[in-house]
Amino acid sequence: MDQDAFILKEDSEVEREAPGGRESLSDVIGFLDAVLSSEPTDIGGDRSWLHNTINTPQGPGSAHRAKSEGEGEVSTPSTQDNRSGEESRVSGRTSKPEAEAHAGNLDKQNIHRAFGGRTGTNSVSQDLGDGGDSGILENPPNERGYPRSGIEDENREMAAHPDKRGEDQAEGLPEEVRGSTSLPDEGEGGASNNGRSMEPGSSHSARVTGVLVIPSPELEEAVLRRNKRRPTNSGSKPLTPATVPGTRSPPLNRYNSTGSPPGKPPSTQDEHINSGDTPAVRVKDRKPPIGTRSVSDCPANGRSIHPGLETDSTKKGA
């Protein structure tokens, strides 16, 4: 008996739960139809239509359901819960792009702050069109405490007082060449490269370095005398026959313009030719013509110094 009563009780509970499930499904379908049929609105527009009650066809007894045990509990449809869930989803979708945009703006600001100090001079100013201040200081403060060079301080001082340069020139003071280095002093060996060296500029004050002084006429003359080119031996001298000691060249006559006697062939450049620094060069001797005998081979007594074919023939004839 107890088992049969328990089975009947379960069947009655299933029958009571079935109308409620169909009721919630019909509410969802009606809500979707209303959303699809309505016109799209902006994110920030009026969303009061979401709070309106959706009238869906309901059967008798669907709004109020009484239990079989006689309890007076009333169950309302779940349309309000569905509206609240849809509103939360819509608000979540709208808040997500806004949060992403806000995060992107923060990232851009952080990147600009991170790279702003390193690209201070290279960054493009935003107000260049209207001629406003670019934000770059002409004389930035020495924040890190590094010592500045003297040339930089002097350049800044000369830029602040442009009349000082003209006063120095009017007084005849030497004008310092910006960014230049002093020329090395070569000492006494300045003219060692045959006058092509440049004289280093010397200053009147020992504590001033890197100063070029306008030369005076006396200084220019001294430099020219010092760097005067020395005579070189590279030029060639005219070729002149060397004179042999103990001999005298015959006078010129009308038979031979070279100074040789009529019976002697014209003299060639057989002598040693000496120039200033060139070594002695001997020109190759010219052979006499066939059938003639050179003067040096015929001594005064008529005998040949070097016995040849003629001496042998005389001996055979004798």
From Swiss-Prot:
Biased segments, Basic and acidic residues type: 7-20, 83-101, 150-168
Keywords (A to Z) from UniProt: Phosphoprotein
Residues with the Phosphoserine modification: S68, S125, S192, S249, S257, S260
Compositional bias of kind Polar residues: 50-59, 191-206
Protein name: Protein W
Presence of keyword Phosphoprotein: yes
Source organism, top-level taxon: Viruses
Gene that encodes the chain: P/V/C
Region annotated Disordered, chain positions: 1-23, 38-318
Keyword Transmembrane: no
Leftover remarks: The P/V/C gene has two overlapping open reading frames. One encodes the P/V/W proteins and the other the C/Y proteins.
